[in-house]
Amino acid sequence: MLSCRLQCALAALSIVLALGCVTGAPSDPRLRQFLQKSLAAAAGKQELAKYFLAELLSEPNQTENDALEPEDLSQAAEQDEMRLELQRSANSNPAMAPRERKAGCKNFFWKTFTSC
């Protein structure tokens, strides 16, 4: 019984001493500087990673353009021209106002069709 009490007392004493040493330890300014530098380096690494990712994403476009033959370039130019023409034609004729519609067109209005 005495040995059990002694073991419990020694265990409690060691825990109290360990906690006292940890809380009473002076803070090291070098440790704080090291942590701040490591946090700053991590932020720099994220920016660097974003930069390299942007470079990697732009590289396949460059290699594809270099690998294109003159025939492919002419086809690509034709496709671009067709796309521009479609955009121009879509933008040149805006949607007509309801009053400018042709006579005889029908709109759905409250359960019935009405002519314009």
From Swiss-Prot:
The lineage of its organism: Eukaryota, Metazoa, Chordata, Craniata, Vertebrata. Residues 62-82 are annotated as: Disordered. This is Somatostatin. GO terms for biological process: cell surface receptor signaling pathway; cell-cell signaling; chemical synaptic transmission; digestion; G protein-coupled receptor signaling pathway; hormone-mediated apoptotic signaling pathway; hyperosmotic response; negative regulation of cell population proliferation. C-terminal amidation of the neuronostatin peptide is required for its biological activity, including for the regulation of mean arterial pressure. GO terms for cellular component: cytosol; extracellular region; extracellular space; GABA-ergic synapse; neuronal cell body; neuronal dense core vesicle. GO terms for molecular function: hormone activity. It is found in: Secreted. InterPro entries: Somatostatin, Somatostatin/Cortistatin_C. Disulfide bonds join 105-116. Belongs to the somatostatin family. The modification Alanine amide is found at residue 43. Residues 25-88 form a propeptide. Keywords: Amidation, Cleavage on pair of basic residues, Disulfide bond, Hormone, Pharmaceutical, Secreted, Signal. PANTHER family: SOMATOSTATIN (PTHR10558:SF2). Residues 1-24 form the signal peptide.
